[in-house]
Curated annotation (Swiss-Prot):
Protein name, as recorded: PR-toxin biosynthesis cluster protein 7
Keyword Repeat: no
UniProt entry keywords in alphabetical sequence: Membrane, Transmembrane, Transmembrane helix
Function: Part of the gene cluster that mediates the biosynthesis of PR-toxin, a bicyclic sesquiterpene belonging to the eremophilane class and acting as a mycotoxin. The first step of the pathway is catalyzed by the aristolochene synthase which performs the cyclization of trans,trans-farnesyl diphosphate (FPP) to the bicyclic sesquiterpene aristolochene. Following the formation of aristolochene, the non-oxygenated aristolochene is converted to the trioxygenated intermediate eremofortin B, via 7-epi-neopetasone.
Compartment list: Membrane
Organism: Penicillium roqueforti (strain FM164)
Length: 186
């Protein structure tokens, strides 16, 4: 067996910076396209938070004196494409408004959710349907955030990845909750 070579460059790391939750409305199924079945899932609300203080080695200047607390406003949505009833290609667009400031945060994301028995149980409303824990489903999103907030301007340049869990309430997939991680290269 050949020895593995060690990469001389430092490896990037993920640092927990916050959380986001989307409250989901009733899904509308569209037709089949060459890339998959189109559906629309309205986002009716939720919340977005960041930690404070920011982790060591963060590297982006922040004027924040507290963690962000923001409300996800109704009117956004997820516009996924479903591939072969096995995979959802996620495409989210929402707006949040700061609760501890009056600034607006435009949040977009894309990602993947591989469907497994837990998700099929939720969609079929079976007796086994339940909320998932982090890591039980292969679901992730990459976020882009735009804001006019000087305190949270660092979000405009942050490379953010979300690890997802699904919340089952009232006999349906009612919410999606994500831990947010900043991708740091040093």
């Amino acid at each position: 067996m050949e020895p593995q070579t060690k990469d001389p460059d430092p490896l990037p790391r993920l640092v927990h910076i916050g959380e986001i939750q989307f409250n989901l409305g009733e899904v509308t199924t569209g037709g089949v396209t060459p890339r998959g079945t189109f559906i629309f899932c309205p986002i009716t609300g939720g919340h977005f938070t960041t930690v404070f203080p920011l982790p060591d080695g963060f590297g982006i200047h922040s004027e924040a004196i507290e963690g962000l607390r923001a409300e996800v406003l109704p009117g956004g949505g997820d516009y996924p494409l479903i591939h072969n009833n096995e995979l959802a290609e996620l495409n989210v667009s929402v707006v949040a408004k700061g609760l501890n400031n009056d600034h607006i945060f435009r949040i977009t994301s894309f990602g993947i959710c591989e469907w497994n028995k837990l998700i099929f149980d939720m969609m079929g409303q079976t007796a086994a349907a339940r909320s998932t824990e982090m890591g039980e489903i292969n679901a992730w999103q990459v976020f882009r955030i735009n804001t006019d907030s000087p305190e949270y301007a660092w979000l405009n340049w942050a490379c953010i990845i979300g690890q997802e869990r699904l919340i089952y309430e009232d006999s349906r997939m009612a919410k999606t909750h994500m831990k947010l991680f900043q991708f740091l290269v040093k």
